[in-house]
C-alpha cells in the first residue's frame, strides 16, 4: 500500500536548490555555469519566480545527483497547491449525465 502525504503549502523547489547550493558552498554564479544556464535564470528559480522545467530538472539531476522526477513532482505539488488556494475563483460546474 502506498501512502501519499499532501502538503498544504509546499515550498517552491527553488528553495531546496538554494539550500543545497549553500550546503555545498557553491555560489549561484558557479552553479549556473555548471548547469549551462544564466545566473539570472537560476536566480529566478531559486527565488520562486520561475518554474522548474523538464530540461532544468534533468540538469539538476546531473549536477546534484537527485532525480529529475523528484524536481518535477516538487514543482507540480507547488503549482497545484497554489491553484487550490484560489480554487474558489475557478467557476466550474460538475458534469452531470445527460437525461435520456
Q: Where are each of the predicted segments found?
A:
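A short, Lys/Arg-rich alpha-helix, primarily the initiator
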Residues: 2-26, 73
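Hydrophobic side chains within well-formed alpha-helices
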Residues: 13, 67-68
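Short, charged recognition helix plus adjacent turn
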Residues: 70-100
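The DNA-recognition helices of helix-turn-helix-type DNA-binding domains
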Residues: 38, 49, 64, 75-78
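Residues within the alpha-helical elements of helix-turn-helix
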Residues: 23, 34, 63
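Short alpha-helical DNA-recognition segment
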Residues: 26-44
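Short, basic-rich loop-to-helix N-cap that marks the start of a DNA-contacting helix
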Residues: 49-62
